[in-house]
């Protein structure tokens, strides 16, 4: 078992990583006999893990209820949020309740925002069951739901009291979801740590195959990198924005296709390449490093060209709605080199379009 601590100005919380944690009472040290718990999950995850978590908490003397919301990014909505509120109210939960998010990034985001909002805030625990959620979305307190006009437009910064990462949950994860998580893993190396990027180049096949030792190291390293930046910049006023490499481009893909048609990690994969190519156009990143990133993403079984039929100009309306737009300027996370990212507003719209064009479906432009 491994542990990473997220050190905030006012408090800290643990991220625990290991196999078999869901059924281990020691994983729930922040709960005690008599505590009220509401578990938020979806039918797919609940079929595998809800009984284990419920039985373990009952064994601790907790009173446990659960609510299931539909599965998928297209259900990361105010309607799903309202389902959670209704369940909490119908079961007479109050400010003493602890809400548990049992699932992937959608569950974590919606349940986290419910915890931030219900009776002005209740405690919550993240139990991420996808690789993407384990290395990224469950850590750091970003919670949100989508709006038809943009992703994550309604939300709050709200930190969990703990994160429990049971690597056994990855064994039931579809291979496509594993690859989507690896996009965020590769992102950490690209923005913060060239040595980790090089380790990934040597070990990506072990991660695709879900080898336990490599997985645990990878998850721990990603969580540590995320914890470090969250400790410096909890509410994304500075360095934390670097975690959005590829996301401005990627969110445009997701919104254009309709949420859920491409997985978030798949869209971020292409978005990172478009950001890398823009970095090359601006004179920062070498063509060789763009190719290294492209090769690593391909080895992770991720898309490396934009969706069929999506023209470069179709990105722009979504990109201009991005939360990082300030003072009428499109601010993008780019790469000085592999392992070093920065934020700039210096790229022209034509340069952005040229970068997107480089990774647009070949047959569409022939």
From Swiss-Prot:
State the reactions this protein catalyses: 7-phospho-2-dehydro-3-deoxy-D-arabino-heptonate = 3-dehydroquinate + phosphate
Q: Which residues bind Zn(2+)?
A: 184, 247, 264
**Tree of life domain:** Bacteria
Keyword terms: Amino-acid biosynthesis, Aromatic amino acid biosynthesis, Cobalt, Cytoplasm, Lyase, Metal-binding, NAD, Nucleotide-binding, Zinc
Binding, NAD(+): 71-76, 105-109, 129-130, 142, 151, 169-172
Any idea where this protein resides?
A: Cytoplasm
Lyase: is it a keyword of this entry?
Answer: yes
Q: Does the keyword Thylakoid apply?
A: no
Q: What are the required cofactors?
A: Co(2+); Zn(2+); NAD(+)
Annotated Pfam families: DHQ_synthase, DHQS_C
Q: Which parts form a coiled-coil structure per UniProt?
A: none
Biological-process GO terms, alphabetical: amino acid biosynthetic process; aromatic amino acid family biosynthetic process; chorismate biosynthetic process
Q: Name one GO molecular function term.
A: 3-dehydroquinate synthase activity
Q: What GO cellular component term, any one, is given? A: cytoplasm
| Family that this chain belongs to | Belongs to the sugar phosphate cyclases superfamily. Dehydroquinate synthase family.
Q: What is this protein called?
A: 3-dehydroquinate synthase
* Native organism: Actinobacillus pleuropneumoniae serotype 5b (strain L20)
């Amino acid at each position: 078992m491994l542990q990473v601590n997220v050190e905030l100005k006012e408090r800290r919380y643990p991220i625990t990583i290991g196999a078999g944690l869901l059924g281990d009472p020691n994983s729930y040290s922040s709960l005690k006999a008599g505590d009220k718990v509401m578990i938020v999950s979806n039918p797919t995850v609940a079929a595998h893990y809800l009984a284990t978590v419920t039985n373990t908490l009952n064994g601790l003397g907790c009173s446990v209820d659960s609510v299931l919301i539909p599965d998928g990014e297209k259900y990361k909505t105010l309607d799903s949020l309202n389902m959670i509120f209704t369940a909490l109210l119908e079961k007479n939960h109050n400010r003493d309740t602890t809400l548990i998010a049992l699932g992937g990034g959608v569950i974590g985001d919606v349940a986290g925002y419910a915890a931030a909002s219900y009776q002005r805030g209740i405690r919550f625990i993240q139990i991420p069951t996808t690789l993407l959620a384990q290395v990224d979305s469950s850590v750091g307190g970003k919670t949100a739901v989508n709006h038809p006009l943009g992703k994550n437009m309604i939300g709050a910064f709200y930190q969990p009291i703990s994160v429990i990462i049971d690597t056994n949950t990855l064994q039931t994860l579809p291979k496509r979801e594993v690859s989507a998580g690896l996009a965020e893993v590769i992102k950490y190396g690209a923005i913060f740590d060239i040595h980790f990027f090089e380790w990934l180049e040597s070990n990506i096949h072990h991660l695709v195959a879900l080898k336990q030792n490599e997985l645990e190291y990878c998850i721990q390293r990603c969580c540590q990198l995320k914890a470090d930046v969250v400790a410096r910049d909890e509410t994304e006023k500075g360095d934390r924005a670097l975690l959005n490499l590829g996301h401005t481009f990627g969110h445009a893909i997701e919104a254009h296709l309709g949420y859920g048609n491409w997985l978030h990690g798949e869209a971020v994969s292409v978005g990172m390449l478009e950001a890398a190519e823009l970095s090359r156009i601006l004179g920062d990143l070498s063509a060789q490093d763009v190719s290294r990133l492209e090769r690593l993403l391909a080895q992770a079984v991720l898309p490396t060209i934009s969706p069929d039929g999506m023209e470069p100009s179709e990105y722009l309306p979504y990109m201009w709605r991005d939360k990082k737009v300030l003072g009428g300027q499109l601010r993008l996370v780019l790469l000085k080199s592999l392992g070093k990212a920065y934020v700039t507003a210096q790229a022209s719209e034509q340069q952005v379009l040229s970068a997107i064009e480089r990774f647009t479906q070949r047959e569409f432009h022939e």
